[in-house]
Amino acid sequence: TKMISVAVCDEPAGKYEFYGYVKYSDGIAIGKKNEPFQFDPGIFMDDDGKLYLYTGFALAGNPILLDGSKPTEHGPMCFELDPSDMLTVLNGPSYIGVAGEKESIGTPYEGHSFLEASSMRKFNGTYYFIYSTMNSHELCYATSDSPVKGFQYGGILVSNGDVGLEGVPDVKHARCNTGNTHGSIIELNGKYFVFYHRHSNRKQSSRQAMAEEIRFEDGKFYQAEMTSCGLNGGPLEGKGSYPS
């Protein structure tokens, strides 16, 4: 778990085969040079053909998961990879400006510092870094005009307890059981959707995939409300039968 592996396949649904470890030019795998724990990798290819890897995990109180590694104290790490093999590091690691917990104090990131689940998107020339915060139940975003630096906190995208919406100031008032979440944003036919997961049966191991349309105006995303019908355009009619 200290390294990042790559698997390849000719079809997106599999069957995948091991391809190699992401490595430095000297052949040593990332994670083997005493870097912070490599976790939840996200890949982004920019319009100019440059390829970036984002990774990181900030929770110090999980010794089993960390397995002797150290958590990141400075937010997510970025590596530029060689697009010809998608394995070899050209530049990095570097930190992109999304604050860790200690660094967030007194900044817009305070209360929403980086935990895990790195994902990069680009809309209308602006880079949007999407991540799960130390609150765990929410996805937030930060923006920059560069994929490798200068990210400023943007806001909450979604919470699997609707924490942050009107009347839901904190987890104690959450509309349902909360837990960690991972996800990202997709633009489809001019509309934007946030994909994430919630937890059913009050168990962290029972993760249910979710999606909501999200409002996007003047470069800003506004927190989406969690529903069960995010891709249906509204509630189901309650007629007939529906697949689970």
Pin down the residues of each PLM region:
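Carbohydrate-active catalytic/glycan-binding domains of CAZyme proteins
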Residues: 1-244
